[in-house]
Amino acid sequence: ESDEQRTDALEAVLEQHPDCLLCCDDRIAFDLMRELRNRHIRVPEQLRLASLYDSELLSGTTPAISAVQFDAERLGSTACRMLLDVMAGKDIPLRQVQGYQVILRESTK
Protein backbone atom coordinates (compact mmCIF):
# COMPACT_ATOMS: atom_id res chain seq x y z
CA GLU A 1 0.00 0.00 0.00
CA SER A 2 1.50 3.30 -1.08
CA ASP A 3 1.37 6.66 0.68
CA GLU A 4 -0.84 7.92 -2.14
CA GLN A 5 -3.32 5.09 -1.61
CA ARG A 6 -3.45 5.79 2.12
CA THR A 7 -3.97 9.50 1.49
CA ASP A 8 -6.78 8.77 -0.98
CA ALA A 9 -8.42 6.37 1.48
CA LEU A 10 -8.19 8.91 4.31
CA GLU A 11 -9.69 11.66 2.17
CA ALA A 12 -12.59 9.40 1.18
CA VAL A 13 -13.26 8.59 4.83
CA LEU A 14 -12.97 12.21 6.00
CA GLU A 15 -15.50 13.31 3.36
CA GLN A 16 -18.07 11.27 5.31
CA HIS A 17 -17.43 13.38 8.46
CA PRO A 18 -16.96 10.45 10.89
CA ASP A 19 -17.01 10.90 14.67
CA CYS A 20 -14.32 8.28 15.19
CA LEU A 21 -11.79 6.24 13.23
CA LEU A 22 -10.98 2.72 14.44
CA CYS A 23 -7.69 1.41 13.06
CA CYS A 24 -6.72 -2.24 12.59
CA ASP A 25 -3.42 -1.88 14.41
CA ASP A 26 -1.16 0.38 16.39
CA ARG A 27 1.11 1.44 13.53
CA ILE A 28 -1.80 2.56 11.36
CA ALA A 29 -3.26 4.52 14.29
CA PHE A 30 0.12 6.11 15.01
CA ASP A 31 0.62 7.14 11.36
CA LEU A 32 -2.96 8.38 11.13
CA MET A 33 -2.50 10.56 14.22
CA ARG A 34 0.48 12.21 12.54
CA GLU A 35 -1.50 12.76 9.33
CA LEU A 36 -4.46 14.23 11.20
CA ARG A 37 -2.09 16.60 12.99
CA ASN A 38 -0.61 17.64 9.61
CA ARG A 39 -4.14 18.40 8.41
CA HIS A 40 -4.85 20.43 11.57
CA ILE A 41 -7.60 18.02 12.63
CA ARG A 42 -7.74 18.02 16.42
CA VAL A 43 -8.04 14.68 18.19
CA PRO A 44 -10.38 14.15 20.08
CA GLU A 45 -12.11 17.53 19.72
CA GLN A 46 -12.88 17.10 16.00
CA LEU A 47 -12.31 13.38 15.50
CA ARG A 48 -11.77 10.50 17.91
CA LEU A 49 -9.18 7.84 17.15
CA ALA A 50 -8.71 4.28 18.45
CA SER A 51 -6.87 1.08 17.58
CA LEU A 52 -7.81 -2.60 17.69
CA TYR A 53 -4.30 -3.41 18.93
CA ASP A 54 -2.53 -1.76 21.84
CA SER A 55 1.19 -1.13 22.24
CA GLU A 56 3.56 1.27 23.98
CA LEU A 57 3.59 3.25 20.74
CA LEU A 58 0.01 4.42 21.37
CA SER A 59 0.42 5.49 24.99
CA GLY A 60 3.34 7.71 23.96
CA THR A 61 1.43 9.83 21.44
CA THR A 62 -0.13 13.19 22.20
CA PRO A 63 -2.94 12.69 22.79
CA ALA A 64 -2.49 9.05 23.80
CA ILE A 65 -4.54 6.72 21.57
CA SER A 66 -7.29 4.48 22.98
CA ALA A 67 -6.98 0.80 22.11
CA VAL A 68 -8.16 -2.74 22.66
CA GLN A 69 -5.71 -4.77 24.72
CA PHE A 70 -5.61 -8.56 24.50
CA ASP A 71 -3.22 -11.44 24.98
CA ALA A 72 -1.83 -11.84 21.44
CA GLU A 73 0.11 -14.99 22.33
CA ARG A 74 -3.00 -16.67 23.72
CA LEU A 75 -5.05 -15.58 20.72
CA GLY A 76 -2.45 -16.98 18.31
CA SER A 77 -2.20 -20.23 20.25
CA THR A 78 -5.98 -20.67 20.24
CA ALA A 79 -6.17 -19.93 16.51
CA CYS A 80 -3.39 -22.43 15.79
CA ARG A 81 -5.05 -25.13 17.88
CA MET A 82 -8.37 -24.54 16.10
CA LEU A 83 -6.69 -24.70 12.69
CA LEU A 84 -4.99 -27.99 13.59
CA ASP A 85 -8.36 -29.34 14.76
CA VAL A 86 -9.98 -28.37 11.44
CA MET A 87 -7.15 -30.01 9.52
CA ALA A 88 -7.65 -33.16 11.61
CA GLY A 89 -11.35 -33.19 10.72
CA LYS A 90 -12.52 -32.30 14.22
CA ASP A 91 -15.50 -30.08 14.91
CA ILE A 92 -14.67 -26.67 16.28
CA PRO A 93 -16.95 -24.05 17.83
CA LEU A 94 -18.30 -21.50 15.38
CA ARG A 95 -17.30 -18.78 17.80
CA GLN A 96 -14.39 -18.51 20.20
CA VAL A 97 -14.53 -15.64 22.69
CA GLN A 98 -11.22 -14.30 23.97
CA GLY A 99 -10.72 -11.86 26.80
CA TYR A 100 -9.87 -8.24 26.09
CA GLN A 101 -9.81 -4.87 27.76
CA VAL A 102 -10.65 -1.48 26.27
CA ILE A 103 -7.99 1.05 27.26
CA LEU A 104 -9.57 4.50 27.13
CA ARG A 105 -7.04 7.24 26.59
CA GLU A 106 -7.23 10.89 25.59
CA SER A 107 -7.92 10.26 21.88
CA THR A 108 -11.53 9.25 22.55
CA LYS A 109 -12.47 11.49 25.48
Where are each of the predicted segments found?
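Short beta->alpha junction loops
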Residues: 1-4
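Flexible loop/turn connectors
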Residues: 9-109
